[in-house]
């Protein structure tokens, strides 16, 4: 850092952050070199300002992959690209299926696992959307299986709920209106991955239906 004297006599600290990309090691294309240098500069600004650093291809590739995953995640949310598979829960007494657990999977090849989806939802502050979609889409799947006679209709439905999240009043009312037939068969399981939130847990209990 350097200190400069302004025309009014005041002192101001001045520092410079910069990024460097090399020709031809990083690229032979001028626009690509500028993009790489900009990326290096922004990495300095994110970490510790007042330094100059060289372009890191490995870091750039990792950043590009993370950006693409975030794009895919929001596409998945906006288009509701989820499937809820029903895992049967069998009675030890007579071997009959008395319940199903709805297991979330993403419908995009690069984003299928629940842990991936929940991690991105946490980073992008979209846990509420996952909670809402899980409640609605799992119930929709139950209704579809019932209408196509793939289930009897008296089975319970276990749904994984995020501990810190709950549907708002309007969402809860819409849920009950659409799936009133299912209200006495829903079993809410609180996920252990998320921190417990007493307010959210109370809101879940107070939801209509």
Residue ranges and their predicted role:
Residues 204-209:
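Short beta-strand/loop segments at the ligand-binding rim of alpha/beta enzyme cores
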Residues 3-6, 10, 17-25, 32-47, ...:
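Cyclic nucleotide signaling catalytic output domains
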Residues 2, 21, 87-89, 105, ...:
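Output-coupling edge of small sensory domains
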Residues 65-122, 160, 189:
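Active-site core of bacterial EAL-family cyclic-dinucleotide phosphodiesterase domains
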Residues 12-14, 98:
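PAS-family sensory domains
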Residues 96-99, 127-201:
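Catalytic core of bacterial c-di-GMP phosphodiesterases, primarily the EAL and HD-GYP domains
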């Amino acid at each position: 850092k350097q200190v400069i004297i302004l025309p009014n006599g005041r002192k101001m600290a001045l520092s410079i952050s910069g990024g460097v990309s090399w020709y031809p090691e990083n690229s032979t294309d001028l626009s690509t070199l500028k993009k790489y240098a900009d990326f290096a500069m922004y990495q300095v600004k994110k970490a510790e300002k007042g330094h100059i650093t060289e372009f890191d291809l490995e870091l750039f590739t990792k950043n590009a992959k993370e950006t693409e995953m975030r794009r895919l995640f929001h596409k998945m949310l906006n288009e509701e690209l989820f499937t809820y598979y029903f895992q049967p829960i069998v009675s030890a007494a007579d071997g009959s299926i008395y319940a199903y657990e709805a297991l979330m999977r993403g419908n995009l090849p690069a984003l299928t696992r629940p842990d991936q989806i929940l991690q991105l939802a946490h980073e992008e502050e979209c846990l509420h959307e996952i909670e809402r979609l899980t409640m609605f889409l799992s119930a929709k799947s139950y209704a579809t299986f019932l209408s196509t006679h793939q289930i009897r209709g008296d089975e319970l439905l276990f749904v994984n709920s995020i501990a810190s999240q709950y549907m708002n009043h309007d969402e809860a009312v819409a849920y009950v209106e659409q799936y009133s037939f299912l209200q006495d068969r829903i079993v809410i399981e609180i996920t252990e991955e998320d921190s417990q939130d007493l307010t959210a847990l109370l809101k879940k209990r107070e939801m209509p239906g």
